C-alpha cells in the first residue's frame, strides 16, 4: 500500500488530500500507526514520495517539480517523516520524480534516477534496508530520460514501477550487465530482497483470493461502521464567530439554505435540517447571469440566517456570485468537499460567521453536519493542513451536544446484523397478528 507522507502547500495539485497533513511530527506519528497496522495485517507499506513531494505546485505526472530548499530545511521538514518511518522499521519506500539541487547537482535529473538520492542518502546515510520502489516510470517527470529502468537500478532502486517500453528497457539492463555497469550480484541482491519480503508477508502460503462473496467480506458491517466513524470524526468547525453555533431549534423561524452544485447532492442535509427548523431552499447554478445572481442575493438577504452548502469542487463558475455576496445576516458555510476548494471563494468564506468542513458529501456526513449545527452531535476535528490565509493548521472549534441524537449498534459492541434479525422476528410477529406491537430489550 502506497502512503503519501506530507503536504504543506494547499495548491499542491497531486498530493493534497492524500497526505496526513502539514506538521512533520504529526504526519510521522500517523504514518507509523497506519503503516504498522498494514504490515501487521500482511500488507507491505510503502512511504512516498521520497525525499518529499509536499511543498510543490507541479504535478510530477506532467512535469518535474523542484525542491529548491537547503539541506537544513530538508532535514527538518521534508525528510523528518521518512526518517521516523525508517526508525520504526517500515518495509517500503518510493522515490519520487523530483529535482533536488542541494542533493543532486545535475540539472533535470529526477531523484528517482539519482544515486546521490537513492543510494547515498536513502540507503547509506539514512540506513534504509527495506524495498525501494521508483514512482511510475511512465510519468512526464521522468519520461524525458533514456533507459529509465537501467538508470533507476543503477541509482539503487530495487523495483521499477510501470516502465513504458519493456522491449527496450530489458535489453538495456542486460547489456549494462555485460559491460559491467551493473553486476549480476546487484540484480541477484535486489531479487533476493523482493523474495524475502514476499516470504515474510506470507505470499508463499496464501491461496488465491476467493472472489465469491468478496464484496460482502470487505464491506462488512464492522468495516462500514469504521469508515462511517472516521468520516464523522473528521468533521471540523473551522470558526464560530460570535458563537453563532449552535443554532436554536425553532420551527417558527425560517433559515435559508443555498445549495452550490447539484441540489440533489445535499438532499440528506436538507432533510436533517428540516427536523430542527423551517427551511427555504435555494439553488445556485453555474455561470448564472448577473441579473439572476443579484436576484438570488436579494432573496437571501431577507433571512436572518443563511446556510451555504457547497458540494461542487470546481467553484470558478460560481465566483461571480460570491464576489458580491457579503450578507448582513450571519452566513454559515458547509463544505462537503476537500478543504482546499474553499480557496476559490476565499473572500466570501473570510466573511462567514461559521465554516464547517465535512470533506465529503456522503449522506452520513451531511446528516452529522446538520446535527452539529444544532449541537445534537459533537465535532472536535482539527485542520491537518493550513488553507492559505483563511485557516491555520490545527484550526478547529469543539461543539459538544447536550444529548446524543442517535446511536449506532457497533459503537456499543453490538452487531447491526444481529439486531436486523431481531427486528425481522419482531415484525413477523406483528404481521401474523401475534401482538399489536412490541418492545425489545437486549441484556
Say what each PLM segment does.
Residues 1-2, 44-49, 91-96, 130-134, ...:
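Structural recognition of the beta-strand scaffold that forms the well-ordered cores
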Residues 22-186, 193:
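Second-shell residues forming the walls of enzyme active-site clefts
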Residues 194, 427-443:
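A short, well-structured edge-of-sheet supersecondary motif
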